[in-house]
Swiss-Prot record:
It holds the Pfam family BacA. It is found in: Cell membrane. It catalyses: di-trans,octa-cis-undecaprenyl diphosphate + H2O = di-trans,octa-cis-undecaprenyl phosphate + phosphate + H(+). It is an enzyme of class 3 (hydrolase). This is Undecaprenyl-diphosphatase.
Amino acid sequence: MDWMELLKAVILGMVEGLTEFAPVSSTGHMIIVDDLWLKSTEFLGKYAANTFKVVIQLGSILAAVVVFKDRFLELLGIRGRHPGGKPRLTLLHVIIGLLPAGVLGVLFEDYIDEHLFSTKTVLIGLVLGALLMIVADRFAKKAARAQTVDQITYKQAFLVGLVQCLSLWPGFSRSGSTIAGGVLVGMSHRAAADFTFIMAVPIMAGASGLSLLKNWQYVTVADIPFFIAGFLSAFVFALLAIRFFLHLINRIRLVPFAVYRIALAFIIYFLYF
């Protein structure tokens, strides 16, 4: 086993875990780490490399499941709802939020993969996503109607789902677009973040599962240690990142992440253009 290649797998998993759920664009970071430094997945071959990227994303998804496990058990009816008759987030809220991007993603998947995954489009997505986040913070309602995820209405869920369609453009960031959208339609930053992460699990798991089925046959036994290392690294760092982000979001809001995204866009611009 090549320990340097194993370290590359761990580093890529770390980058995926730290950035997948933060509103900073995991795609933008993977461009820098993968293309400019590691050339990380060359040792796996093209098709196994695609599978590796899916596997480390599954590590991030598992971290979100762990953080929100009680909520998912409740949504699926495995655990009973809290008494008191207060409004609660339902599975229907999640489905409504997923529909717009889910439908567009299925219809335009091939076009997006073939025409939108480039350094230039990611650069554009980083900047436009940052501007959306700045606008969201600027016009955020001081007294948000939905202070917690359980106070989100079906209308708000649908509107957030519409804004999530922007994340189909690489670099825009799923969490960045949906949290900004949630804030703009009257959610607190924490409520929007909770709803974003809960919605992300089924849509990411579905997309990753399909991709895994398409590419798994290209993986060899020798690749397995790298997949395990990347998966575990992504899981651990995503777990830390999600908990840290949720703890901070109501206090620091979105502008610091927007500034970071613009700085990242400048770095990519000067490195590539």
